[in-house]
Amino acid sequence: MVTIALGSKNPVKINATKEALDVLKLNWDLIGIEVDSGVDKQPFCDQTYVGARNRALNVIRVTNADIGLGIEGGVCNVYGKFIANAVVYVITKEGLENFAISSSFTLPSSMVSLILQGKELGEASDIIFKTNNSKTKEGAIGLLTNNVINRKMLYVQPIVLALYPIYNTMINNTPF
């Protein structure tokens, strides 16, 4: 049995990983362990990649799982607009590494202002929408889209994409 360890105990990230494994019809054991990302609570741009990779590395070291999975949300200034997205990073115990990125979405100036004052995206969302702990529920994307797209949905596709070299090799016996 393959064991995949997620570097988070956030229920949205755990449920997104479960859904991705279900979509792929992979009967893998999933464990969620909180590990350090090594980046600020609100990563910007390249730090999002660093945080996701660090989570994958740290969780595989702590658990000795077959696969380490790190998910890190971040924001970045692109052409004068602040966007939010997530990076999903996978590392196998054999050293194979791959990553994928979620869809990106622009943030309203009210959120950007709070983020630039030192708030995390989730905190900024909670302040603006008068919610509590939205990062463990629908997330900023859910609040902004009236839950047409929520945080879990945003994560499922990049999890599938980050894992493809692993499950495709296992199913089809093809090299990466």
UniProtKB/Swiss-Prot annotation:
Mg(2+) binds at residue 36. It catalyses: XTP + H2O = XDP + phosphate + H(+); ITP + H2O = IDP + phosphate + H(+). Coiled coil: none annotated. Its EC number is 3.6.1.73. The keyword Nucleotide-binding applies. Its cofactor is Mg(2+); Mn(2+). GO terms for biological process: nucleotide metabolic process; thiamine metabolic process. Keywords: Hydrolase, Magnesium, Manganese, Metal-binding, Nucleotide metabolism, Nucleotide-binding. Disulfide bonds: none annotated. SUPFAM superfamilies: ITPase-like. GO terms for molecular function: ITPase activity; metal ion binding; nucleotide binding; ribonucleoside triphosphate phosphatase activity. Binds 1 divalent metal cation per subunit; can use either Mg(2+) or Mn(2+). It holds the Pfam family NTPase_I-T. HAMAP family: Non_canon_purine_NTPase_YjjX. Homodimer. Phosphatase that hydrolyzes non-canonical purine nucleotides such as XTP and ITP to their respective diphosphate derivatives. Probably excludes non-canonical purines from DNA/RNA precursor pool, thus preventing their incorporation into DNA/RNA and avoiding chromosomal lesions. Belongs to the YjjX NTPase family. This is Probable inosine/xanthosine triphosphatase. It comes from Saccharolobus islandicus (strain L.S.2.15 / Lassen #1).
